[in-house]
């Protein structure tokens, strides 16, 4: 009886954590070339859509500590990158989050986007692409909260 109770409790915890696995939270992005932290992005959910806003940039002392998006177009042109919403429109589609858009502040381009969590919920693979996701690039973000 005691063993059955332990198994049931473990199953309930596993089920609850699986149901709670969403991209909402604080994520650390990693520089592809150096492996160093690059930024912190806060992902929030509003009306079934996830969006991500840059909360902090990790910059070296010789870099501009408050860079602006000089390559962005429209309303984002020359706006501070810190505080900028770069990920929009992600919606849950089964185990994946799809139909989003992601802005690369380095080149000012907006790409289609999708994302998926690993089994632990501690890593988020974010893919930006043009047209078909085959033609794109992925980054792994690490949960920071």
Residue ranges and their predicted role:
Residues 72-78, 125-132:
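Short aromatic-glycine motifs in intrinsically disordered, low-complexity regions
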Residues 29-113:
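Central antiparallel beta-sheet cores of small beta-barrel/beta-sandwich binding domains
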Residues 1-7:
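Bacterial N-terminal signal peptides that target proteins for export
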Residues 26, 49, 121-123:
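Structural motif
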Residues 20-28:
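Cleaved targeting-peptide boundary
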Residues 9, 15-17:
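N-terminal signal peptide c-region/cleavage motif recognized by signal peptidases
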Residues 121-123, 130-145:
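Edge beta-strand at a domain terminus
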């Amino acid at each position: 009886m005691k063993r059955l109770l332990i198994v049931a409790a473990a199953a309930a915890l596993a089920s609850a954590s699986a149901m709670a696995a969403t991209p909402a939270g604080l994520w650390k992005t990693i520089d592809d070339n150096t492996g160093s932290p690059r930024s912190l992005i806060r992902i929030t959910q509003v009306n079934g859509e996830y969006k991500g806003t840059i909360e902090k940039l990790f910059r070296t002392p010789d870099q501009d500590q408050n860079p602006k998006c000089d390559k962005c177009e429209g309303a984002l042109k020359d706006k501070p990158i810190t505080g900028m919403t770069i990920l929009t429109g992600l919606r849950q589609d089964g185990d994946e989050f799809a139909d989003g858009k992601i802005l690369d502040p380095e080149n000012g381009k907006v790409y289609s986007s999708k994302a998926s969590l690993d089994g632990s919920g501690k890593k988020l693979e974010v893919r930006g692409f043009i047209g078909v996701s085959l033609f794109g690039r992925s980054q792994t973000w690490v949960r920071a909260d």
